[in-house]
Amino acid sequence: MNAVIASYLTQQPKPPLLKGAGVRWTPLHFNAEAPTEPAGETVGFCLQKRRKDSFVNYFVVNINYIIYKGYFMDILKQLENEFSLKAWQVKNTVELIDAGNTIPFIARYRKEATGSLDDQLLRELNDRLAYLRSLEEQKKKIISSITEQEKMTDEIALAIENAKTLTELEDIYRPFRPKRKTRASVAKALGLDGLAEKIYAQEKGTPSPEILAQEYITDEVPTVEDALQGARDIIAEQVSDDSQGRKLIRYAVKNHGVISVCGADEDLGVYENYAEYSESIKTIADHRVLAINRGEKESKLKVSIDFDKTIAFDLLYNIHCKGNNACTNEVITAVQDAYTRLIFPSIEREIRNELTDNACASSIKVFGENTRQLLMQPPVKGNVTIGLDPGYRTGCKVAVISETGKVLDTGVIYPAPPHNKIDEAKKIIKNLVKKHNVKMFAIGNGTASHETEVFAAEVIKELDCGITYMVVSEAGASVYSASKTAAEEFPQFDVSLRSAVSIARRLQDPLAELVKIDPKAIGVGQYQHDMPQKELSAALDGVVEACVNSVGVDLNTASPQLLSRVAGINSSIAKNIVLYREENGEFTSRSELKKVAKLGPKAFEQCAGFLRVAESKNVFDNTAVHPESYAAAKELLKICNVSESDIKTGNISLLKSQVETLGTSALAKQLDIGEPTLIDIVSELSKPGRDPRDELPKPLLRSDIMGIEDLKAGMELKGTVRNVIDFGAFVDIGVHQDGLVHISQITNKFIKHPSEMLKVGDIVTVWVLSVDAEKKRISLTMKKPK
């Protein structure tokens, strides 16, 4: 705070602004609750007004006052309550975030400080922290603005202090916000605000409005009706700006209003179900909100909110109609105008925006979870793979990929129409299989996929050597193949061949390949193109970051795109790591990272534990044990009589038995580390270089093919969940058209969302309910037929 103001404040008498029982003025000393100010310096007076069992604090500035409620500490308390956490957990977590630590680092290596909060909860807490800080900043701006206007009162100050959302703040600030030209502002400019005040007061004995209006007749206001209309316009705006009334109307509309939809076009197409549709605002599902919004955007639907205006009028009359005279009748007219012209259209927009925001947040969450499951699909390692990017006129692009993802061979075949060179294509593929000892085919699911799948199944049958295949999502492959990243990686290949390489690698290691693609292009969600792109990108980037750091990254083989997703590493540092690798050969230890340009101590601290160096002499370098814990890990091995060579060979039975005998609590104290860190160290040393994806069910590989025409009601099939959405899940059953398991067909028990039972990549048993071959619709159930 400015020293001049501080000096001025200390000399002021106790301001007589607020009086009453439970009010007292005391000198205010800044302390830890106001960390930005000098500790112990008296800079003003603090009003403490007893409210239940708490105090509300104000600072006084020039006899106007602003709130400075130690907001940092209040935010911590709010986070503590909202997330059901202990005070120390929130305090430590916020301090770690503010110190520039990444979420993956905090989740993995600061468990003692946070109480082992997981990555997802930390991200939610971080987002909420940002929102609450934004809210406090907005409060300060509003306080400053109202104070400058010399309109601050104790009621307004309390209302601002109590505001929990930006919407509440906007309601409070509405009367003080600089306005564009309105009917009310025009009336005020004509000097009619005095008339409006007299009419709104509705005092007994007040002359009739017509008599009152006579005093305001001028050249600009030639008639009594003109004067009364101007007064009503001023009152209407006053009613509209009243935060209490808006709050009541908003609550009533939210709880009793109805979304009404009707067709706006003769050909509604996919929106036929919404031709004459209505549903309570309280119960409408998120996916229906998004569907209706899209239909409205495409000019297929008209959407509105229906609400009984007589209820709204009664709510507003209770606030603004204080008498029962001629002036009251004018106020009633103004209230009705305020609701119809100003309040309801605003509330309608606000509620629809809120419904959309909530639906988008839900959809983004589903999209993120689906993306997480897709990225965490188990890799199919150790097999030479042929990637097939199907096509008709331009042919099917072929790429042979080694066990480590290196391109061994490429080509183009033409087994599909209009060429139909099936025999020639078979000969080429069989030669490639024999030449490179191919064990798997990865087939893109785009154009001509079905014909290519039939062709591949025939080749596999003729070879009869145990080859399997899988249809792989092409989503984003074309985006990647035409990108600068792909051009830098494969300058010698044309765009189409790069797609074939990407398809093969997606089967071998989905995570390593998919990180090269904008996660929005992966296409596992609902209405992703209708989402706020900034929020969607932030959420998906967080998911990708969490997945990459959960698995860990091989420092000597990772692409720049994969490295840039590691905690503490940006794209510039990632490129420098690859450049160092090219100039100096493979990394031989984690500590060698410190030699990379722009990778400073903080970046090293954040990233080191997530990077693996399999070739290092130090066994810990190929685990998730952080370098800061190496000394403790070595001491642990010494205590347990286990050598580093035992860890390398997997001879860890003695380590486990010794830890169990000695006890984690006693061992942690002896090693001077926390129990969570000790548990993680033991887990990592038990399986050095482990990949958490290996513990998940393997992808469903096939060797034969079925068509949609082969499906019959009641048929039992194995399938892979490809997408989970609000109303069900789409399952790949090997017929080129995913079937829908409606939420009602997932289980016999009640579930709110399909994600409670299913996730992308799950292998499930389903039964065919019905097939519409013409519309290519397959209905499935997971409930076993009786």
Role assignments for model-derived ranges:
Residues 19-20, 32, 38:
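Glycine-biased, low-complexity coil/linker segments
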Residues 102-103, 118-185, 189-218, 550-695, ...:
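Accessory alpha-helical DNA-binding modules that contact the DNA backbone or grooves
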Residues 121-124, 131, 135-145, 149-387, ...:
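Duplex nucleic acid-engaging cores and interfaces of nucleic-acid transaction enzymes
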Residues 168, 470, 476, 481-551, ...:
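Long, charge-rich intrinsically disordered scaffolds of nucleic-acid metabolism proteins
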Residues 212-216, 220-224, 277-278, 309, ...:
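Low-complexity, acidic/Ser/Thr- and charged residue-rich accessory regions of DNA metabolism proteins
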Residues 350-368, 521-552, 669-713:
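Long, charged amphipathic helices and adjacent flexible linkers at domain junctions
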